Swiss-Prot record:
Up-regulation conditions: Induced by low levels of proline and by osmotic shock. The leader of mgtA mRNA functions as a riboswitch, favoring transcription under low Mg(2+) conditions. Under limiting proline levels the MgtL peptide encoded within the mgtA leader cannot be translated, thereby favoring the transcription of the mgtA ORF. Induction by osmotic shock also depends on translational regulation by MgtL. Induced by low extracellular levels of Mg(2+) via the PhoQ/PhoP two-component regulatory system.
Compartments, as annotated in UniProt: Cell inner membrane
GO MF entry, a single one: P-type ion transporter activity
Protein name: Magnesium-transporting ATPase, P-type 1
Coiled coil regions, renumbered to chain: none
Residues in the Extracellular compartment per record: 116, 309-317, 716-724, 791-799, 852-866
Stretches assigned to the Cytoplasmic side: 1-94, 138-287, 336-695, 745-766, 819-831, 887-898
Origin species: Escherichia coli (strain K12)
Family to which this protein belongs: Belongs to the cation transport ATPase (P-type) (TC 3.A.3) family. Type IIIB subfamily.
EC code: 7.2.2.14
UniProtKB keywords: ATP-binding, Cell inner membrane, Cell membrane, Magnesium, Membrane, Metal-binding, Nucleotide-binding, Phosphoprotein, Translocase, Transmembrane, Transmembrane helix
Subunit structure: Interacts with MgtS.
Length: 898
């Protein structure tokens, strides 16, 4: 029965111990039913004629004005999901109370009250109140901090609005929560769909709907109004839904639903109680908590049986066992975890690192492999157009002008290469090209083709398709080349020439993009991917992206911190190897994407662990490498900012992106860097390890202290004719000890504890308990002997003196263990605790010594200790600290120290 109760309780512990932002991406939405009325509404919107759409939403092609926006927002509310709305304070208070430890204490308190032990019930109630209120305060602070941090990296949408009283309109970038039904927005590759939308115009628009349907392949969307073949709105060509992402193409669409009224919003409301799979951090906390609770559930009955059998007073034995159970309950664990993580998140924000999910901090500190892209991480992210040449390597204005037309007229996601082409073309040429050539159509970029095309016209008779992209992908659709002004077949001789020229450019560290063209008769209708065939290779544009000055020292710092850096790039292996060499990273054997496709999972996992540089990768290659590294037991971080990085960001233990990343990358990430730099990342890793170290201190102290206390209680219960300490004493001792732990999140951490990755190790915790728990028992038994034979407190009439003596020793030794276990060094000499922790422990020790002498002593059934007791007290504490230090030295040499 007990096992079933606590199994249910513990199941909800991880989410209660850690404040997690209720992000919609975390919800499990597949196969969840929405109201029939919503399905009918969506199907109606899917086929509604455009003219009727304008009337339905009281909008117009020029966009909404400010008054219309405010009216729509008043009617429909903000574009936020219900889960994102703040809960009332009393809901937060209940959530902070509702953890297994507080529930357990409440049960014990109720038993005490029922047995008329009112003082014990009051002390237990006070402990629950302190734990709940401290946790509530820390949750409120962490929520406030998380909201402030999220506001720094909010996603935006491009919307068409009327911008002045004259009725002039323009495209504005606004936060997505400001969208209202009737807004017209632009979509491009990499965008998160910010609301439910009806497509008005689309060009090769492909959307990933896995968050709603579970289907991994993207689906094509279009502006057709034909009757849908299915009754499922998700299969309608004209509708896009909040929470999905644009994989490729462009579109304009009207917002038809926002917030809770969206398909995703309805699903989110119905799955808010569903349990998501706990991550490594939550599993670690859960295992530790379950271990401590099971330990208490086993030992409390044992104490009851021994005391009841030896003393004959089963009622008193039951009260004592109850107090032991309270003492073994680590009710401050939720508060310690929450406050430590929240403090870590705030400190990380000062290092330009924004934490989206608080429990990601532990994975940050545990990370031992960092996979990252090359561009903007190792390099300056300021790409410069260095060369524009024909296939022989001679400068060619024709190639530059073709590249300019492609970059200028494409409406998709303009990357740094496009910007470099536009900036690398002189203004006069740009004006001339813009006046002579008009855009007809475009075929947007996607990561399957790795190229994009625009169709332009200089006259009414012919169209010209201009295509640029990765060299191999362009060669795959070329049949001819322009060589010395003539069009010749693309044969083996030309291919060898092309390889020779491009390899030379790559070895110089230049990134090569191919440019090809095709002349076509003028025609009506859209151009498709099939038109990218029989192209003429015009030449290449080559870009320079020099390494950052901070990259080399950052890589050295990461290596010194025990983190292996691996480069996963879609770029050429020659360019990537050149950059690696310049920043002091030994690339060694380079693995390219085509090689990966021929390897089994086991072969690739083996290769991934010993390989530093992977080149010419697709998004799926990156995701597979990250997944296999995790399978081999590594804690893997992935840093990326592009659409192609999103799968790997989700697969990694910790996804890291930057503030300027595309929406889908920022949404997939756990950590957002305000500055795209490995040096900033290294500082964040150190702070993550510091945060984890402080959490681990409390867990180790609690586990070892509880383990030792139980041994002491069992020995005393078996051999003493009276209780070694009254239930009341145990409760007060536990309460004072809890107060001393409040400052642990603010403690200092030794340098050696942050020099290597830190991760949960349940085996180490069990070993730690066995080594350090019995130390306190040894000195507890010495105290028993001292009080029995030296002070002759060996009869029921003198038991108050005995209990007072052990009360003081127990409280002081339990408080001092904080300073002994917080460091592997010699405490107070080689390593000092932070001043808040020092102050709290000193106050608790003074209170503990003073209680037997205070007016409360008689009420607490304590008595003043003789002055001759205190030299013995000093000797016992000194011996305790000395032995602990000796055992600590042996333990750290043999097993290491977390």
């Amino acid at each position: 029965m007990f096992k079933e109760i606590f199994t249910r309780l513990i199941r909800h512990l991880p989410s209660r111990l850690v404040h997690r932002d209720p992000l919609p991406g975390a919800q499990q939405t597949v196969n969840t039913v929405v109201p029939p009325s919503l399905s009918a509404h969506c199907l109606k919107m899917a086929v509604m004629p455009e003219e009727e759409l304008w009337k339905t939403f009281d909008t117009h092609p020029e966009g909404l004005n400010q008054a219309e926006v405010e009216s729509a927002r008043e009617q429909h509310g903000e574009n936020k999901l219900p889960a994102q709305q703040p809960s009332p304070w009393w809901v937060h208070l209940w959530v902070c109370y509702r953890n297994p430890f507080n529930i357990l204490l409440t049960i014990l308190g109720a038993i005490s009250y029922a047995t008329e032990d009112l003082f014990a019930a009051g002390v237990i109630a006070l402990m629950v109140a302190i734990s709940t209120l401290l946790n509530f305060i820390q949750e409120a602070r962490s929520t406030k901090a998380a909201d402030a941090l999220k506001a720094m990296v909010s996603n935006t949408a491009t919307v068409l609005r009327v911008i002045n009283d004259k009725g002039e309109n323009g495209w504005l970038e606004i936060p997505i929560d400001q969208l209202v039904p009737g807004d017209i927005i632009k979509l491009a590759a990499g965008d998160m769909i910010p609301a439910d939308l009806r497509i008005l115009q689309a060009r090769d628009l492909f959307v990933a709907q896995a968050s709603l349907t579970g289907e991994s392949l993207p689906v094509e969307k279009a502006a057709t109004t034909r009757q849908p073949e299915h009754s499922n709105p998700l299969e309608c060509d004209t509708l896009c839904f909040m929470g999905t992402t644009v994989v490729s193409g462009t579109a304009q669409a009207m917002v038809i639903a926002t917030g809770a009224n969206t398909w995703f919003g309805q699903l989110a409301g119905r799955v808010s109680e569903q349990e998501s799979e706990p991550n490594a951090f939550q599993q670690g906390i859960s295992r530790v908590s379950m271990l401590l609770i099971r330990f208490m559930l086993v030992m409390a009955p044992v104490v009851l049986l021994i005391n009841g059998y030896t003393k004959g007073d089963w009622w008193e034995a039951a009260l004592f066992a109850l107090s032991v159970a309270v003492g073994l309950t680590p009710e401050m664990l939720p508060m310690i975890v929450t406050s430590t993580l929240a403090r870590g998140a705030v400190k990380l924000s000062k290092q330009k690192v924004i934490v989206k999910h608080l429990d990601a901090i532990q994975n940050f500190g545990a990370m031992d492999i960092l996979c990252t892209d090359k561009t903007g991480t190792l390099t300056q992210d300021k790409i410069v157009l260095e060369n524009h040449t024909d296939i022989s390597g001679k400068t060619s204005e024709r190639v530059l002008h073709s590249a300019w037309l492609n970059s200028h007229y494409q409406t998709g996601l303009k990357n740094l290469l496009d910007t470099a082409v536009l900036e690398g073309t002189d203004e006069e040429s740009a004006r001339s090209l813009a006046s002579r050539w008009q855009k007809i159509d475009e075929i947007p970029f996607d990561f399957e083709r790795r190229r994009m095309s625009v169709v332009v016209a200089e006259n009414t008779e012919h169209h010209q398709l201009v295509c640029k992209g990765a060299l191999q992908e362009i060669l795959n659709v070329c049949s001819q080349v322009r060589h010395n002004g003539e069009i010749v077949p693309l044969d083996d001789i030309m291919l060898r020439k092309i390889k020779r020229v491009t390899d030379t450019l790559n070895r110089q560290g230049l990134r090569v993009v191919a440019v090809a063209t095709k002349y076509l008769p003028a025609r009506e209708g859209d151009y498709q991917r099939a038109d990218e065939s029989d192209l003429i290779l015009e030449g290449y544009i080559a870009f320079l992206d020099p390494p950052k000055e901070t990259t080399a020292p950052a890589l050295k710092a990461l290596k010194a911190s025990g983190i292996t850096v691996k480069i996963l790039t879609g770029d050429s292996e020659l360019v990537a190897a050149k950059v690696c060499h310049e920043v002091g990273l030994d690339a060694g054997e380079v693995v390219i994407g085509s090689d990966i496709e021929t390897l089994s999972d086991d072969e690739l996992a083996n290769l991934a662990q010993r390989t530093t540089l992977f080149a010419r990768l697709t998004p799926m290659h990156k995701e597979r490498i990250v997944t296999l590294l995790k399978r081999e037991g590594h804690v893997v971080g992935f840093m990326g900012d592009g659409i192609n990085d999103a799968p790997a960001l989700r697969a990694a233990d910790i996804g890291i992106s930057v503030d300027g990343a595309v929406d889908i990358a920022r949404e997939a990430a756990d950590i957002i860097l305000l500055e795209k730099s490995l040096m900033v990342l290294e500082e964040g890793v150190i702070e993550g390890r510091r945060t984890f170290a402080n959490m681990l201190k409390y867990i180790k102290m609690t586990a070892s202290s509880n383990f030792g206390n139980v041994f002491s209680v069992l020995v005393a219960s078996a051999f003493l004719p009276f209780l070694p300490m009254l239930p009341l004493h145990l409760l007060i001792q536990n309460l004072l000890y809890d107060v001393s732990q409040v400052a642990i999140p603010f403690d200092n951490v030794d340098d050696e504890q942050i020099q290597k990755p830190q991760r949960w190790n349940p085996a180490d915790l069990g070993r730690f308990m066995i080594f350090f728990g019995p130390i306190s028992s040894i000195f507890d038994i010495l105290t028993f002997c001292l009080m029995w034979w030296v002070f002759h407190a060996n009869t029921p009439e003198t038991q108050t003196l005995f209990q007072s003596g052990w009360f003081v020793v127990g409280l002081l030794s339990q408080t001092l263990i904080v300073h002994m276990i917080r460091t592997r060094r010699v405490p107070f000499i080689q390593s000092c605790a932070s001043w808040p922790l020092m102050i709290m422990t000193v106050i608790v020790m003074i209170v503990g010594i003073a209680l037997p002498f205070s007016p409360l002593a008689s009420y607490l059934q304590l008595q003043a200790l003789p002055l001759s007791y205190f030299p013995w007290l000093v000797a016992i504490l000194a011996g305790y600290m000395t032995l602990t230090q000796l055992v600590k030295g042996f333990y750290s040499r043999r097993y290491g120290w977390q």
